[in-house]
Swiss-Prot record:
Its main location: cytoplasm. InterPro entries: EFG_II, EFG_III, EFG_III/V, EFG_IV, EFG_V, EFG_V-like, EFTu-like_2, G_TR_CS. The gene is fusA. GO terms for cellular component: cytoplasm. Signal peptide: none annotated. GTP binds at residues 17-24, 81-85, 135-138. Catalyzes the GTP-dependent ribosomal translocation step during translation elongation. During this step, the ribosome changes from the pre-translocational (PRE) to the post-translocational (POST) state as the newly formed A-site-bound peptidyl-tRNA and P-site-bound deacylated tRNA move to the P and E sites, respectively. Catalyzes the coordinated movement of the two tRNA molecules, the mRNA and conformational changes in the ribosome. It comes from Streptococcus equi subsp. zooepidemicus (strain MGCS10565). Transmembrane segments: none annotated. Pfam families: EFG_C, EFG_III, EFG_IV, GTP_EFTU, GTP_EFTU_D2. GO terms for biological process: ribosome disassembly. Residues 8-282 form the tr-type G domain. This is Elongation factor G. The lineage of its organism: Bacteria, Bacillati, Bacillota, Bacilli, Lactobacillales. It is found in: Cytoplasm.
Length: 692
């Protein structure tokens, strides 16, 4: 079957926001107006189309980014719903990686909130064009112009309204289109009867002022428009729309719209804006990658004629069809039943069936084309971030960066029967979510799970119970500490054993130096003249990696260390890989005596919003928790405090803040960086770990 929609008429968009800004409801309405749903599901009734996992419906938050496809105005719009809660940032990152544009949803009462900043920053890193939808205009305290101001103040975004609201809160009844200079009046809350009228007299002056500001802002991004504007010539609506589109796609300008998804107002106009201002796959630069055979950089322009190249961005286990791999096609065409090359793993995979998803129903299709987003059944080895390409034209596309987990819990099955089931369940969950790690403590045999935050692990333990019917006891959350060296040193590792039969002999000299933060472990072989034979070099590296998994101070993984093997000796008969592995680990232990080993702890960026009267309490909380305040700003009668606080001190803070502010204070935290723990704390940690 031929393509239904041309590339120019395809939009791949994400909907991103702070938790509770009304993102899922907005997506719902889009699906409703584009004819994919017959009855609207409300998030607060727990029956939304996109939130299809049971826990999402209970908690009223979106956890997994469901990809769905819809049609509007002769275009295909593929939508990826992204979670707004910080514990699920990997979900946001991996969806941003495969999008061409996004709609940022704000709560008009609060404007830009902490998580909006996080997602906005990630979208800027990936160069994603955005339009902004100020939602919840019907809410008490909704203030459209205040929301626009927060985009400037908190995100330094060049954002300008292309619409103005008529009325707000209960009186929100229409929208002024600053391009057509017309008013859309809603006569009911179903969004079915819309009247296009002239702008009401009392709003005319404000509309003219903001249209002028809009034209000026767009003209600043385009020389031709600037010349016309300065010479006082009239800029036509077509030129204005083209100017906004170009500036938005270049990520130089962000159009701001308003509405209330819950009351069905403004959603159709927002869909029009998605088509008008967000890019098609043809409008963005061709994706780049590396040819695994030649190491040369290559690109894949969006075209059906090019060789097939796609990126797997999500794995899901579906109760009916098993393992689903969501992928974005960048170039070429793929038919079900064909073979592709997973260039990231170097494995050939067969595509069983191809499904196009709509929230949680699915339609089987034969072929996907460049620019499409679909899910494949039957891929065995593919994980998040892998490239899938034509076997004859291999390319590895840029992958998705995965943040390290910062919090861990011990889990143990309640019965022997649960033991095996738990292993399978954890493995499946880890396949779906790369920020979730499962480790078995070799000494104690305990299973430890690690993730991005308490909610993240709660949800996973909950899924284990529901989807895999595994009952487990969960320990208290623990911080994922790390260890490192703070000084350079040289150390010898010498291992010799003679006890009848074949002996063991390994001798190495290694120079250890601190590495840059986040660079991990780097090994360099500087052996000259074969004093350590080449076949034993990998054993030295392996020995170091294995001993660094349990650090020298308190057994935490070591990070950010460079090791240079520069001298050593060997024995013709007795040297072996095992002997050199042991020698390397002895060198590490020896180095620890002089390399100033340190324990690192995760520092969280904490944003606390509390009534002004409680500001003193909040500052006290931060200092008492070894934190440092980074900045403050007033927001109505509240104060917003940003601070860096060690994760170890944040457990149970929700209860403390709640009682100090009579339930009016809230806080959000997101991992920021690792930092040395103070000496006194370090000694406590070592004592606790040795005493166990």
């Amino acid at each position: 079957m031929a393509r239904e929609f041309s590339l120019a008429k395809t939009r791949n968009i994400g909907i991103m926001a702070h938790v509770d800004a009304g993102k899922t409801t907005t997506t719902e309405r889009i699906l409703y107006y584009t004819g994919k749903i017959h009855k609207i599901g409300e998030t607060h009734e727990g029956a939304s189309q996109m939130d299809w996992m049971e826990q999402e419906q209970e908690r009223g938050i979106t956890i997994t980014s469901a990809a769905t496809t819809a049609q509007w105005d002769g275009h295909r719009v593929n939508i990826i719903d992204t979670p707004g809660h910080v514990d699920f940032t990997i979900e946001v990152q991996r969806s941003l990686r495969v999008l061409d544009g996004a709609v940022t949803v704000l709560d008009s009462q609060s404007g830009v909130e902490p998580q909006t900043e996080t997602v906005w920053r990630q979208a800027t890193e990936y160069g994603v064009p955005r339009i902004v939808f100020a939602n919840k205009m019907d809410k008490i305290g909704a203030d459209f112009l205040y929301s626009v101001q927060t985009l400037h103040d908190r995100l330094q975004a060049n954002a300008h309204p292309i619409q103005l609201p008529i009325g707000s809160e209960d009186d929100f009844r229409g929208i002024i289109d600053l391009i057509k200079m017309k008013a859309e009046i809603y006569t009911n809350d179903l969004g079915t009867d819309i009247l296009e009228e002239d702008i009401p007299d009392e709003y005319l002056e404000q509309a003219q002022e903001y249209r002028e500001k809009l034209i000026e802002a767009v003209a600043e991004t385009d020389e031709d428009l600037m010349m016309k504007y300065l010479e006082g010539e009239e800029i036509t609506n077509e030129e204005l729309v083209a100017g906004i589109r170009k500036a938005t796609i270049n990520v130089e300008f962000f159009p701001v719209l308003c509405g209330s998804a819950f009351k069905n107002k403004g959603v159709q106009l927002m869909l029009d804006a998605v088509i008008a201002y967000l890019p098609s796959p043809l409008d963005i630069p061709a994706i780049k990658g590396v040819n695994p055979d030649t190491d040369a950089e290559e690109e894949r322009p969006a075209s059906d004629e090019e060789p097939f190249a796609a990126l797997a961005f999500k794995i899901m286990t579906d109760p009916f069809v098993g393992r689903l791999t969501f992928f974005r096609v960048y170039s070429g065409v793929l038919n079900s039943g064909s073979y592709v090359m997973n260039t990231s793993k170097g494995k050939r995979e067969r595509i069983g069936r191809i499904l196009q998803m709509h929230a949680n129903s699915r339609q089987e299709i034969e072929t996907v084309y460049a620019g499409d987003i679909a899910a494949a059944v039957g891929l065995k080895d593919t994980t998040t971030g892998d490239s899938l390409t034509d076997e004859k034209a291999k390319i590895i596309l840029e992958s998705i960066e995965v943040p390290e987990p910062v919090i861990q819990l011990m889990v143990e099955p309640k019965s022997k029967a649960d033991q095996d089931k738990m292993g399978i369940a954890l493995q499946k969950l880890a396949e779906e979510d790369p920020t979730f790690r499962v480790e078995t403590n070799v000494e104690t045999g305990e299973t430890v799970i690690a993730g991005m935050g308490e909610l993240h692990l709660d949800v996973l333990v909950d899924r284990m119970r529901r989807e895999f019917k595994v009952e487990a006891n969960v320990g208290a959350p623990q911080v994922s500490y790390r260890e490192t060296f703070r000084a350079s040193t040289q150390a010898r590792g010498f291992f010799k054993r003679q006890s009848g039969g074949k002996g063991q002999f390994g001798d190495v000299w290694i120079e250890f130096t601190p590495n840059e933060e986040g660079k991990g472990f780097e090994f360099e072989n500087a052996i000259v003249g074969g004093v350590v034979p080449r076949e034993f070099i990998p054993a030295v590296e392996k020995g170091l990696i294995e001993s660094m998994a349990n650090g020298v101070l308190a057994g935490y993984p070591m990070v950010d260390v460079k090791a240079k093997l520069y001298d050593g000796s060997y024995h013709d008969v007795d040297s072996s890989e095992t002997a050199f592995k042991i020698a390397a680990s002895l060198a590490l232990k020896e180095a620890a005596k002089t390399a100033q080993p340190a324990i690192l702890e995760p520092m969280m960026l904490v944003t606390i919003t509390a009534p002004e009267d409680n500001l003193g309490d909040v500052m006290g909380h931060v200092t008492a928790r070894r934190g440092r305040v980074d900045g403050m700003e007033a927001h109505g009668t509240s104060q917003i405090v940003r601070a860096y606080v060690p994760l170890a001190e944040m457990f149970g803070y929700a209860t403390v803040l709640r009682s100090a502010t009579q339930g009016r204070g809230t806080f959000m935290m997101v991992f920021d960086h690792y930092e040395d723990v103070p000496k006194s704390v370090q000694e406590e940690i070592i004592k606790k770990n040795k005493g166990e």
